[in-house]
Amino acid sequence: MKKYKSEISGHLDIIVTENEDNFEGEKETWKEIQIHGDPEGLKSFARLLIKLADLRQDDLDELPVGAREHIHLKPKYDLSVSSEEVIVGRLDAKGTGAFYGKYISKEFK
């Protein structure tokens, strides 16, 4: 059996926090994704993002048309034990460039 080799080196912690605030009697709730790491962990995460961004999906025979390349980052193996599992991937689909249906673009002003 081949030993798992993480693309993340150093220390990287990715957590979700739930926040709540009351303003003028109105309760507001929101979530935040927090990404923290030591220099080595942050740099290896950056390299992973650049690798995904530069990847030519159309050249991947094993990736079906319409699919999106992605990588799973798992607590204990890639991330700290306190982290949530994270999937980092391309928004654009192979062959079509289409974004998935749930995507809502940010507003440009």
Q: Which residue stretches match the model-derived regions?
A:
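Positively charged, low-complexity terminal tracts
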Residues: 1-109
